[in-house]
Amino acid sequence: MARVKRGVIARARHKKILKQAKGYYGARSRVYRVAFQAVIKAGQYAYRDRRQRKRQFRQLWIARINAAARQNGISYSKFINGLKKASVEIDRKILADIAVFDKVAFHHSG
């Protein structure tokens, strides 16, 4: 059997991981073993947080709408219920934007 020399492939794989770990602190950006673990963990966090971001933004929008609605003397749930009954189909993202940047329009919507 022919001798298999794997140096090129191993170096390429190591380079790829170290490139991904660029900017990490200390050994995490220099030592392959540590960098590999850091990159794997970073990927797990990124995967988890892409899902959490959607929840967090919805929470933020609801908090902003609630605050603006209460300034106009109505609770969030009653405000949303009123919009549903009036068959107004504006999502929470746009409502929150209006609540923050156009208080007059928001006041007239409720």
Swiss-Prot record:
A UniProt-annotated Pfam family: Ribosomal_L20
Which keywords does this chain's UniProt record carry? Answer: Ribonucleoprotein, Ribosomal protein, RNA-binding, rRNA-binding
Where is the signal peptide, in residue numbers? none
What GO terms are given for molecular function? Answer: rRNA binding; structural constituent of ribosome
Q: Which domain of life is it from?
A: Bacteria
Extract one GO BP annotation from the record: ribosomal large subunit assembly
What cellular component terms from Gene Ontology apply here?
ribonucleoprotein complex; ribosome
Return the similarity comment: Belongs to the bacterial ribosomal protein bL20 family.
Q: Describe the function of this protein.
A: Binds directly to 23S ribosomal RNA and is necessary for the in vitro assembly process of the 50S ribosomal subunit. It is not involved in the protein synthesizing functions of that subunit.
Instruction: Write the protein's name.
Output: Large ribosomal subunit protein bL20
Organism equals Shigella boydii serotype 4 (strain Sb227)
Protein's gene: rplT
